[in-house]
């Protein structure tokens, strides 16, 4: 045989030591606090605070765009709601909001199908503080 003896890997059962950075609770977190809201009525802005909106497609239908006088609005998929485009733009848009000088980033949810599952996981991790 060209290969050596087969060795079975042991499963790491340690919850405290993640195997990869992506397993950290806040691995995807920007410096600016991020809050993921499931619906517009969950947003209660504080007076004097500057908010940036991470919008899925900028649609008024979602109810987030017209909800507040946002300091900055960044769209993942401008106008069309395509998950593939949103996934490509995800980290760029998150970084733009993080560097915009807002006090807090408010993220509206993304459809949890296909690529949306991964984006929602990243948004949930980014909202951990």
Regions found by a protein language model. Give the residues of each.
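General beta-strand structural signal in soluble alpha/beta enzymes
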Residues: 8-9, 107
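Short catalytic/ligand-gating loop segments at beta-alpha or beta-beta junctions
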Residues: 10-20
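Internal gly/pro-rich beta-alpha loop/helix module
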Residues: 1-8
